[in-house]
Every structure is written in structure tokens, then in C-alpha cells.
């Protein structure tokens, strides 16, 4: 685990701590109509199962806002109301949810912001100042355009508004749709405020595009110690947002959990259907939370070397293969018997590690 994380003010969204020494949380956003409580609840359940810590829902009209009371009652995750344009929906939402997200570029005048702050104070819930490069306030857009500087100036202006209202339970996000502006904006703002940061690349695209952009932008920031909560925005299945987010946390040294799959890129030496085997291993072992390095290699050329550094490895030969545990060969089996035996051995190793931690 990296030790260079920037320590920020800690806030709470429901029972989830954001900032300070708290783990970096992951979140997603439902795509159902929020007033459709059954559909929205089903999506929240899916996110909970995928490992999300928080969930955000769109509040597009009064019907959505009024549905939040019941949705909060049935939600297994802390609930964040996402408000654009209509501050009165935030006033209704504040009576039920765990946090409010506002976009300073479209929420309205200082008086409207004050009304939202007063409602959040009354219920003791935090606010996210959600700055987007594509919807900056007119004065910042005209002066700076959709640049990191414009985003930072907007964030500072709105942070000062909240501070002047004696409200400091907030976090900040600075989202652009590309890697460079996103990184530059967060880097620029970090030394200027103590508040926690919500990381994200907005409108990042489909699974492939978003995974690349998010890994570069969010992973880069996380390795610099920047970031307290995050969302990977993907045009696609909800669960993928959490899966990719947690992978970024693991590989940036911010989360020690689960399987780290090591597999070779294939070449003419492979002795099995390695692509299929690596996919099967990853899927079957996805439930394991114990941090383990697992190697799946198509031949013995690199397998033995990799196995020295892996917790468990499988190496294919000619219609057979080796299972290697902590650098030692424990099985030589026919290819048809390798997969199930390997899965059992990995699961047993995970149990051993968990038991040793408890002891």
C-alpha cells in the first residue's frame, strides 16, 4: 500500500467516511427514473452486490424528489441526490438523503445556494460541489474557457460561498471528459483546499474507452496521494463501474484486496487455450477478497519464474500442466483436471491466509 496519501478534512455520507484516513470509497449512479422505486432499488442492490460504497440518483423533477423518502428507506447504500438547475428539488431531497450534489454552473444565485446549505445544515448532511468543464458558470467560462484554471476558479469561488455560510461539510469534484484536463485541475486545486476530493472523468465513454481514461487519470492521481472517493463513468452496465474502480484502487496501491491475475500475452509456445482459461480463472475466483497473486501461464518458459513470485500458479504443458503453490510444484495433472483442482487450491490458500490473519 502506498503511504503518500494527502490527508483531507473528513466528512460522512451516511455511515461512510470520506477523507482523512478513511478508505477510498467507490460509487456509481443509477440510470432508472428515480421515481420508479422498484427499478431504482433493483439497480442499487446490484451495485451493493458489486461492492459499491455509495450510490447517486438523478433528481430531475418533483416526483423524483418526493420519491427519495421511500427510496432512502429501502436503499442498502447511502443515498446521494444529484441536483441540476432546480434548487427547490435539493430542498426536498435534503429531508431524506445522505448527501446532495450540486453543479455550481447551473444551480442558480447565491440566495439559492444559501437555501440549499441551510437545508443541509438542518439535516447535518454534506454537499458535493460538482464542477464540470462543460458547464462552468458564465464568468469563469468567458474568462478561462473549459480549462483546468476555469474549473479550479469555480471550485474556489463556490467553496468560499459555503465557507461564508459557515458550512464546511463538503467535498469537491473537478471533472472533464479527458485525462489531461482532469489531472491538471485536481493537481492545481489540491494545495489550495483541505476538503476531500471526489475523482472522476465525466462522459468517459464505453467500457474500453472509460477504463483507459479512468485508469490513467484516476490511477495517476491516486498514486500521487490525491483522491478520497471516486466514480468510473461508463456507458454500459452498472457493475462494470465498480469492477473497474476497485481494480484501479488495487493497482494504484490504494486497496489491498482480491485476486491479481497474471497471465502471459500468448505466443506460439502456448500449449492450451490460455485466453479461455485466464477468463475462467478470473471469473471463478472473483469472490475472493484475500489479496493473492495468481499466475496463469501457457507454457513452462516463463511459468516457473513467475511462479516464484506468485501465491499460486498454473503452467500448461503438452495436454498436461503444473499447479505451483508459493514457488513449489504441488500437482502435475492432465489438462482436463487442472482447472477445478486449481480453483480448489486457490480457495484453500485464501482460507489459510485469512485464518493466519485472525490468529
Swiss-Prot record:
Its EC number is 1.17.7.3. Pathway: Isoprenoid biosynthesis; isopentenyl diphosphate biosynthesis via DXP pathway; isopentenyl diphosphate from 1-deoxy-D-xylulose 5-phosphate: step 5/6. It comes from the Bacteria. Its cofactor is [4Fe-4S] cluster. Keywords: 4Fe-4S, Iron, Iron-sulfur, Isoprene biosynthesis, Metal-binding, Oxidoreductase. It is an enzyme of class 1 (oxidoreductase). One of its GO terms (biological process) is terpenoid biosynthetic process. Belongs to the IspG family. Converts 2C-methyl-D-erythritol 2,4-cyclodiphosphate (ME-2,4cPP) into 1-hydroxy-2-methyl-2-(E)-butenyl 4-diphosphate. This is 4-hydroxy-3-methylbut-2-en-1-yl diphosphate synthase (flavodoxin). The gene is ispG.
